[in-house]
Amino acid sequence: MKQRFRSLGCLARLSEYSESSLILRFFTRDLGAVSVLAKGIRRAQTRNQLMALGEYELNLYPPTESGLYLLGEISSVKERDLSASPQHWAAADCALELLSSLIIPTEESPVYYTLLDSYLDFLQTRKGSAILLWWRFLLRVFNFFGTPFDLLACSLCQATDESIAAWDRGTGALFCHNCLATSEY
């Protein structure tokens, strides 16, 4: 067998693969989004301990022709139970699903992992509207991608001293009074 690889990861999804195995989807600190084949885990007691959104230390074997990493060992680092609030659970799941779906270069995945980890920890401590925290997370992801979304600046002139007067539903652009008066909108 090849050399083991060790990383931290947040569990995004569990899927049954066979009578005794699972396919686990993680967002890891060092590799980004990975799918892991966990052979025999459904027979072991570990399956009851696996919880979505939890942080785990993983020992993985590199993928072979199947493209799935093979799970060597797994241990829980941090449990996150957001099941008491469906809004908080949905906001956490959306963030993890977003990062798992994006194509993130391997060298940048530690930055995104740190953002996700701090977001999930912060979400646990807050009461109230989770959608506001989700938007804050999304804006930070946009900034990391180099496309900041400034809610106080006009999309045409980039002025922040004028108040925003209109929003274009088609493009999402924000316009100040001056640009709205001179534009085709």
Feature annotation, model-predicted:
Residues M1-I23, F27-Y185:
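Non-catalytic alpha-helical scaffolds and adjoining flexible linkers that form interface surfaces
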